[in-house]
Amino acid sequence: MMVFQSFILGNLVSLCMKIINSVVVVGLYYGFLTTFSIGPSYLFLLRARVMDEGEEGTEKKVSATTGFIAGQLMMFISIYYAPLHLALGRPHTITVLALPYLLFHFFWNNHKHFFDYGSTTRNEMRNLRIQCVFLNNLIFQLFNHFILPSSMLARLVNIYMFRCNNKMLFVTSSFVGWLIGHILFMKWVGLVLVWIQQNNSIRSNVLIRSNKYKFLVSELRNSMARIFSILLFITCVYYLGRIPSPIFTKKLKGTSETGGTKQDQEVSTEEAPFPSLFSEEGEDLDKIDEMEEIRVNGKDKINKDDEFHVRTYYNYKTVSENVDGNKENSNLEFFKIKKKEDHFLWFEKPFVTLVFDYKRWNRPNRYIKNDKIENTVRNEMSQYFFYTCQSDGKERISFTYPPTLSTFFEMIKKKIPSFTREKTPSDPISTYWSLINEEKKENLKKEFLNRIEALDKEWSVENILEKTTRFCHNEAKKEYLPKIYDPFLHGISRGRIKKLPPFQIITQTYRKNNIGASWINKIHGLLLKINYHKFEQTIEKFNSKSLSIEKKLSFFSEPQQEEKIDSEEEIKIFKFLFDVVRTHSNDQTRIKNFIDFYEINKKVPRWSYKLISELEELEGENEENVPMEPGIRSRKAKRVVIFTDKEPHNEIYTNLKDNQNSDQKDEMALIRYSQQSDFRREIIKGSMRSQRRKSIIWEFFQAKVHSPLFFDRKDKLFFFSFDIWGLKKKILRNFMWKNKKKKIDKKEEEQSKIEEKRRIEIAETWDSFLFAQIIRGSLLVTQSILRKYIILPLLIIIKNSVRMLLFQFPEWSEDLKDWKREMHIKCTYNGVQLSETEFPKNWLTDGIQIKILFPFYLKPWHKSKFQASQKVRLKKTKDKGEKNDFCFLTVWGMETELPFGSAQKKPSFVEPISKELKKRIKKFKTKPFLVLRIFKKRATILLKVTKEMKNWTLKNFLFIKGKIKDLSKQNLIPLFGPSEIYELNETKKDSIISNQIIHQLSVQNKSMEWTNSSLSEKKKKNLIDRIKTIRNKIDEISKEKQNLTNSCTKLRYDSKIIESSKKIWQTFKRKNTRLIRKSIFFIKFCIEQLSIAIFLGIINIQRITTQLFFESTKIILDKYIYKNDEIGEKKNKKNTIYFISTIKNLISNKKKISYDLCSLSQAYVFYKLSQIKISNFSKLKAVLEYNICITSFFVKNQIKVFFQEQGIFQYELKNKTFLNSEVNQWKNWLRSHYQYNLPQIAWARLVTEKWKKKITQDSLVLNPSLTKEDSYEKKIVDNYKKQNFFEANSLVTPKHNLKKDSIYNIFCYKSIHCTEKNVDMSISIALDNCLVSSFLEKYNIRGIGEIQYRKYLDWRILNFWFTKKVNIEPWVDTKSKQKYINTKVQNYQRIDKITKTGLANQKRNFFDWMGMNEEILNHRITNFEFVFFPEFVLFSSTYKMKPWVIPIKLLLLNFNENINVNKKITRKKKGFIQSNEKKSRRFYNLNKDEKESTGQVEFESDKEQQRNSESALSNQEKNIEENYAESTIKKRKNKKQYKSNTEAELDLFLTRYSRFQLRWNCFFNQKILDNVKVYCLLVRLKNPNEIAISSIERGEMSLDILMIEKNFTFAKLMKKGILIIEPVRLSVQNDGQLIIYRTIGISLVHKNKNKDKISKRYKKKSYIDKKKIDKSITKYQNKTVNRKKNNYDFFVPENILSPKRRREFRILICFNFKKKTARDRNSRFDKNIQNLPTVLHKKKDLDKDKKNLINLKSFLWPNFRLEDLACMNRYWFNTTNGNHFSMIRIHMYTRFPIH
């Protein structure tokens, strides 16, 4: 019962699933979704529902609904019915129908009585309103307009139609679903209307009920139809605005309509004239070609835009021929069979293109040009071609299926009805498919094994290596097509090569294939439709030599010219080109029929226009190759001719008799750009401007157009955002800078900016209006004539006549001289001066400026020259500012300093007169007051004299009075007289106080004497007391005097101290003021630094914390893992691979790298793996150089010996074996770890302890025990011998192409560890030939492939050793002015001829790969040496321009020897490396026996070296020229006739150093433009001295940038600083050869090893034999090993196969096609391995490190192999979308991020 229930339940579920997935349900669902695509047609339907009432309203509702449903039904039927779909889907039909109907409907609703025929009944047909409602809803439903932004809902039905088988049922069900949705929608609208009617709050609105607005409401109801029509019209206009206008469309001319391009559009037989139907080469080129009809007479070709096939319709009318070749009638008549469409083509095509040109540029796309490819492919062209194919044994839809093959299958099915493949079950097919792939792998493996076994048998190279196929167009000379044009190498080409002469390839290739019988196509009858037989023909043996090559040349090269061809020659030519012969098995006769010959190819929609921009038209560079009318809008610009050279420079011009060349003038022109915003932005004319990217404009004249995406990066307005940081900056700036002077300067700067902006606006305004330039130009010329010849002469006459009336001398001569000095120079619109008489070209339309030099200003009088001194004039100029002696004329006759600037203030004529009058009046006023001034002066003198006399008399009177008193005192008291006088004399000098005391005592004594004369005793006592007091006073005074003298002496000493301290204080004060003044800058600097540090700290907080966290966790985990391991470490050798240069950058930047090995780059992983122990490195060699699952068992014991000698193996590992792992190992190991997301412990176990410690270091620390001397200097010869193989095989490879695609394609052939060797293995080239063509010259860089990283070069000093010039002065003469073009190439190639003899004059390393990285990064570039040695400037500039051509030995060797500079240098040298005896003894201590045993080639002399290097350089340049695009070469050929040496030099410079950009110094831009303006004027003048001097004084012409020398050099320009050469930063693509070379060729040698060991190591070596491969490399074997000759030069054995087979071999090996279990192993493979005699024995006792390395190796190698496949899928699998390998990327990289 339970089983029955489950059975019923299962049936119900399956039934439900079937119902849900049925066509009906899906159609109902999609139809219901279509209802929500609401368009303008709903407006009519809703209007009929809402507005119309009554019986007529009901009929209108019914008709509207019926029309709406009928229109939708027609849309659904058009999906299924193709004619209706074409009618409704064509844009021009809808456009033609929509516009007239919209106009009719608009006028219908605006004119009410348009169809009013009076009183008619309701049901009569005269009343067309109901019919119009039906038509409105029907037609507007077909217009497919959408109000919603996306129309995806309406197109869902169209999309699902591609997946549905029962299409009619699906269309019906989808229509029913739409009808259900429509009914529901209309019911919902009805419910909303009922709700509105029932809701009183809406109906009882005050506005509606009020009487005031009743009239407005009624008018609104009456005019609803008009409102609806207006809304509908606006919607339709908006919709039509998104598409281009059908009539006023810019019609672009196709390439066939333009002259000079017909020859380019040849049939695609340039590389393969008759490609087979299945050849990929023909297919690739056929994709390019457009469909053309070729007329037989060669008159014209018609380019048809609809298809791109090549059709040839011919009717061959001949008589049957017998088998033996007897001709009955040999006349062949060719005539064109016209189709029916050709009769009305002249009418139909112009009408269609008038309405809508479907091939023009509708979208405003960018037109990306390509000089080497013709018309570009349309963007809407899908690169995919879908067809069914077998993949994994099952039928699948392939998106890259070859379209030719699908077309072929379709044709076969039509011709052979039984051509149907029986479908078999999927499992047998799948197994069969996998078996086929397995069989392919086995066959490839067997072939590979056979070729390797042939190596042991010492076969020749030709029998071992698989040949690659190249396209040869000259077998005799072995000339091949360039790799970029080789279809075998380049792959699919999407463009046609320009101007390849097709007759060369046709004549040479066809001659080879057609000397026998004509081409017979066996399956031709199956593919072509044969309707009737016209004639019979036998196989004709014809010789192609009988064809006239001259006729072929004329036929192909000049198709435009009419040419008569004889009938026989015409027969032969077209028989040669178009005969196709068919075979019949039953009949001996051959039938030639009317043939429709279709080239089976893919339709590639290609733009039929080859457009040029307006700027290119203005420049006029490509007038021969481009149409006359530009198709791309450029920035608004005008071509202004500034100089026209009417006299030819060379005699070539005089000999030309061509009318075009004779009429053509040599013009020099400048492009004047408009200053307003460039809104056109290189869009193509006729494209929809409204569909361009939206741009934000907030100013009327805006400098640049900004996208909304980047608008936030601009300075916003205040209402857009509030920038707090900007406000802080402004506040700080205002706070720090409060200087008034700087504020004034800022205001002046802002004012000048505003003035400049105003001038630009005025100029653009004049340039934008129609006829404005004509009006302005005529006004300017009128003002110039009026000023020069009417106004100024009239003013001169009036002035001089007035002077004569005032009885003054007239100044006719001075005024006329100034008037004649004034010059009116005609200038272009932007101010370039021409001359007085020459007007600019098209000056009425382009604009004109008139510049007045030395303008005339009327002066009332002229001063003499000696009146105003020079100092006064200088002072005036300093005060008033420098005043220019020129101006520009305005429209109103005013003068401005700059065009469109504000008017200048003229020097006033009345102002000097008024100043002179003021002076005269002032003088007149001062005369009456002159007497008073003199009297006043005399009165002051008299008063001074009287005052002095008065003082003198008073002094004398007092003196006499004093004398009288003294005499009286002496007579009365004689005893006291002398003492008083003495006292007075003493005290007068000492102090005033003592004098006062003595005077008082004397007065008291006199008074006492007068009153008491009788008392003698009292007198005596008084006298005694007086004497005592006087003596006491004298003693006190003497003591005080002594104290005063002592104090004075002390004060003098202290005064010096005070003065010195005062000086110190003054200096301190001065320093303090300076410190205060400068503290502002210091505070500002500190604030800025602090803010930056805070900002960076905030940013880096998260990163620092996470980094510290992960580092701490890693350290803890590492300690935990290795806690129990052995700590003791043995001293092992280190093998450092000098790996890819990007690793050096990575280490020098001191970046810390985590253990996430999947996320590391492949180069870094290999570099770090090289630092493991020697025992592990031996296994790494197997990983790096051999494929894991196949080639490892080919490793023999001799290779181990070789590695042991190199220090890669230890001696104990001599008998150990390589590990032979399979691809399944890494799969099994990775299956256990989901998505490689391993824990930290598992990741850490993959690496050794020493590697773990190394990887956590900040930078690479070199081992101090390893010295550069051991690694380079002591092993120079050994390295030479070790590198002999690599140089002989890898350096001689042909140069890669310069094109990016070709380099990618070649890189696909190489893969990681593989190198593409040359097939030619001859070792006849000497070793010296390889010196110039070094690894640095390999094309490892995209685009040029010759530049190596500059950081390896020690460019502190450039030292040169001149082999053939003893004295440097006559060779490099800095003062000579010879033509530089002749000596440039020779001088610049001297750097290639540098020998290694005297590379260093000091003890400095010229090159240092180990230690120069950090030093060069911090090294300052100085050129002070060149000031004293100008001879070296040439070589220094040489290195700057061409740093990549450096011999390889200079990078591998260091020279630390001191060479005496004063020692006499001789030219004779015994060998290449010998510079002196000491050096040769030290480095090359080799005996003759050793040289003979090694078989080393003796180094050649310097002459041969020089010749070899020159030949290598010439070959290099030849290859570069060969790989260069032929179109550019032809363009260059057209311009080879240079008019001057400067032009030739510039062309040579740009061709040789095109990867270095030549940039002006930014400071010279304005100076150069100013100089050009002055030059244009000076060239036209006969005596330009005066104007030249004045322009120099004004600063218009700068003398520092003048090229005084006629033949200047680029080195001089760089020395002056005018030109700056900047190398373009190109990405490096590392070559596999370089990796192997650095891995094996260079290895460090331990310092403890003796020199004897180094010299003895390579005593036994093999000799070179040109016939065998094993002699191309010198073997390195020990004494104990027998000298057995085996072949080990193929480090990657896969190189035996061709690149194509090599790729297939790798893919089959990397992907295992069998479904195996996790532990399944390939038993057959193991069995084969054990049977081989060279298999290395395995051992079970693997140590821990070996097991870890096995896991690491099995994980890394296939992982990165998949990465390479993912990167190269574009070229291997013909897919350009990288997302196809997204799943691989997901599984390759772990989830946790890198910190």
UniProtKB/Swiss-Prot annotation:
Q: Which residues cross the membrane?
A: 19-39, 68-88, 91-111, 133-153, 176-196, 227-247
Gene Ontology terms: biological process: protein transport
Q: Does the keyword Flavoprotein apply?
A: no
Superkingdom of the source species: Eukaryota
Q: Where is this region: Disordered?
A: 1490-1517
| Topological relation to the membrane, as annotated | Multi-pass membrane protein
Q: Which Pfam families match?
A: Ycf1
Cited InterPro entries: TIC214
Indicate the principal place this protein occupies in or around the cell: plastid
Keyword terms of this UniProt record: Chloroplast, Membrane, Plastid, Plastid inner membrane, Protein transport, Transmembrane, Transmembrane helix, Transport
- GO annotations of cellular component type: chloroplast inner membrane
Q: Where in the cell is it found?
A: Plastid, Chloroplast inner membrane
Residue spans of biased composition, Polar residues class: 1508-1517
In the record, the note on similarity to other proteins reads: Belongs to the TIC214 family.
Role noted for this protein: Involved in protein precursor import into chloroplasts. May be part of an intermediate translocation complex acting as a protein-conducting channel at the inner envelope.
**What else does UniProt say about it?**
There is a partial copy of the N-terminus (positions 1-343) of ycf1 in the inverted repeat (BAF50335).
Quaternary structure and interacting proteins, as annotated? Part of the Tic complex.
Which protein are we looking at? Protein TIC 214
Naturally occurring in which organism (per UniProt):
Crucihimalaya wallichii
Q: Which gene encodes it?
A: TIC214
